[in-house]
Amino acid sequence: MDRAKSRSSITMVLLMVLSTFVGLGTPAATASEIVMTDAIEITPGGTFNDRMVAVDADSLGNTHFVWSRNTQHLYYKMLDARGEVLIDDTQISDPGAHRAWHPDIRVDHADMVHITWTDKAGQWAIMYTLLDPSLDDQSGDQTTDAAISIVGDYEVSLHQQNRDWPAIDVDSENDAHIVWQDSYEPLDMFYQQPQIYYKMLEI
């Protein structure tokens, strides 16, 4: 009996001592070792003023980009995990006068693309659109807004005063949650100082 207790005590001590050496053989990762790709040019731009880009990735490792071109229209592009173009630069804001600023993007669990931005044409508005890239053949050429849009340009918020800097995320039900900075205050209690507003969109 005493011999069995002694063996189990020795075994426990050995396990505790050996467990301290488990992590010693793991090599430390540095930033230069975890870079997956070299920097690549997403859009050549040329005479265009492409700015304010946002990016997210889907379940297959494809990357989805949205940006403002000439601070007028919103553009979208999709690359595969190797950086090859699946959908080329495509205007996704509706035709007409726009002033697209500060877009944000989130890909949901069904690989649908949720986008929000500020339209500064006239009274500033927070906008939203929903894209389904799988509706395109993803052959590397442009598509059209009508071909991949599930929800067209939807007005999330438009009041007196101005609003800007929207951000978006999605939940486990793929519903969109949008926050933004807004100077609208119906009771005029804060002298039009920016407030934070939030809205959930059930898709």
Model-derived features: where do they sit?
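Secretory targeting signatures
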Residues: M1-S32, I178
